[in-house]
Swiss-Prot record:
This is Glucocorticoid receptor. Residues 1-44 are annotated as: Disordered. The gene is NR3C1. Keywords: Chromatin regulator, Chromosome, Cytoplasm, Cytoskeleton, DNA-binding, Isopeptide bond, Lipid-binding, Metal-binding, Mitochondrion, Nucleus, Phosphoprotein, Receptor, Steroid-binding, Transcription, Transcription regulation, Ubl conjugation, Zinc, Zinc-finger. One of its GO terms (molecular function) is steroid hormone binding. It comes from Ovis aries. PROSITE patterns: NUCLEAR_REC_DBD_1 (PS00031), NUCLEAR_REC_DBD_2 (PS51030). There is a cross-link at residues 120, 139, 155 (Glycyl lysine isopeptide (Lys-Gly) (interchain with G-Cter in SUMO2)). Residues 282-314 bind DNA.
Length: 314
C-alpha cells in the first residue's frame, strides 16, 4: 500500500513521454468498445494528442508541400500567410518565409547605408553627405574632423615651449628673437622690457609677456652683492660697480632695478655722468647708496631705518 502511494505522486510530478502515450493509445484502441464510460477521459486526451501529432506532421512536411500544409493546418490562416507569417509561431521553417527572408537580406544593405549618414550628420558638425556612396564619406568626415582638431593642439604645444625657451638668454633656438632678448633685454622693477632694434611687433609683444621669467635669474647675483657687501668695505663697492655695469643691478628680494646703460638716459635719481660707472643704488629704495650700513648697501635715509631697527632689537 505504501509503495502504491509513493508511486502515485511520481506520476503526477513527471509527465508521460511520447512512448508512454503511444502505448497507452494502443491500449485505448483495444479497449475502446468495452469500457465506454470509464475510458471517456482518456479518449479526450487521445484527441488532443492526435491534434498535436497532426501539427507535428504538418511541420515536418511543410518544406515539401507548403500549399498542402496551409490547407490542412487548422492553426494557419490566410491573413498570417499574406503577412509573411511573422505572427505565426509555427511558420519558422516555411520555404516561403525563407525566400522572403532572402529578399529582405537583399534590401538590408540598401537600408543600412541610408540610415548611417543620418546618424553621422547628427553626430558630426553638420557635414552633409548627399552622394550615392555614403560609407567612404563617413570615413572622410571623421578624418576631416580630426584634422580640424589637431592643428589647434599642435599650436598650443608650440606656444608653450616658446615662452620657456625665451626665458633663457643662452639658448639660440629661436634665432633673432633670442639674440634681441640676450643683447637688448633689460628687466625693470615694473616688469617691462626696454625694446631696441625690434623688427616686428609680435616679438615685442612676446617680450612683454616674459619679464616673469627674467626676474628669477638675477637672484644669485643679488646674493653675490650681499656677500661682497658683508665681506669688506670699499673693495666691495668697487666690485658692485663692475657688476652693475652689465645693466642688472638687483634688490636683495629678487626684484630687478632699472640699471644704467650707455645708450639709455640716466634716471633722475642718479647724479653721476653717463660716461662713468653707474651709481651704486640702495637695495631698499633704489636711491643712490651712500655706503654699506649694517651689512646692507643703503642710502642715508635707509641707514637710519636700519639703525633704529638694529638698536630696537638690542
Amino acid at each position: 500500500a505504501s509503495a502504491a502511494v509513493s508511486a502515485a505522486p511520481t506520476e503526477k510530478e513527471f509527465p508521460k513521454t511520447h512512448s508512454d502515450v503511444s502505448s497507452e493509445q494502443q491500449n485505448l484502441k483495444g479497449q475502446k468498445g468495452s469500457n465506454g464510460g470509464s475510458m471517456k477521459l482518456h479518449t479526450t486526451d487521445q484527441s488532443t494528442f492526435d491534434i498535436w501529432r497532426k501539427k507535428l506532421q504538418d511541420l515536418e512536411f511543410s518544406s515539401e508541400s507548403p500549399s498542402k500544409e496551409t490547407s490542412d493546418s487548422p492553426w494557419r490562416s490566410d491573413i498570417l500567410i499574406d503577412e509573411n507569417c511573422l505572427l505565426s509561431p509555427l511558420a519558422g521553417e516555411d520555404d516561403s518565409f525563407l525566400l522572403e527572408g532572402s529578399s529582405n537580406e537583399d534590401c538590408k544593405p540598401l537600408l543600412l547605408p541610408d540610415a548611417k549618414p543620418k546618424i553621422k550628420d547628427n553626430g558630426d558638425l553638420i557635414l552633409p553627405s548627399p552622394n550615392s556612396v555614403p560609407l567612404p564619406q563617413v570615413k572622410t568626415e571623421k578624418e576631416d574632423f580630426i584634422e580640424l582638431c589637431t592643428p589647434g593642439v599642435i599650436k598650443q604645444e608650440k606656444l608653450g615651449p616658446v615662452y620657456c625657451q625665451a626665458s633663457f638668454p643662452g639658448a639660440n633656438i629661436i634665432g633673432n628673437k633670442m639674440s634681441a632678448i640676450s643683447v637688448h633685454g633689460v628687466s625693470t622693477s615694473g616688469g617691462q622690457m626696454y625694446h631696441y632694434d625690434m623688427n616686428t611687433a609680435s616679438l615685442s609683444q612676446q617680450q612683454d609677456q616674459k619679464p616673469i621669467f627674467k626676474v628669477i635669474p638675477p637672484i644669485p647675483v643679488g646674493s653675490e652683492n650681499w656677500n661682497r657687501c658683508q665681506g669688506s668695505g670699499d673693495d666691495s663697492l668697487t666690485s658692485l660697480g663692475t657688476l652693475n655695469f652689465s645693466g642688472r643691478s638687483v634688490f636683495s628680494n629678487g626684484y630687478s632695478s632699472p640699471g644704467m646703460r650707455p645708450d639709455v638716459s640716466s634716471p633722475p635719481s642718479s647724479s653721476s655722468a653717463a660716461t662713468g660707472p653707474p651709481p651704486k643704488l640702495c637695495l631698499v629704495c633704489s636711491d643712490e647708496a651712500s655706503g654699506c650700513h649694517y651689512g646692507v648697501l643703503t642710502c642715508g635715509s635707509c641707514k637710519v631705518f636700519f639703525k633704529r631697527a638694529v638698536e630696537g632689537q638690542h
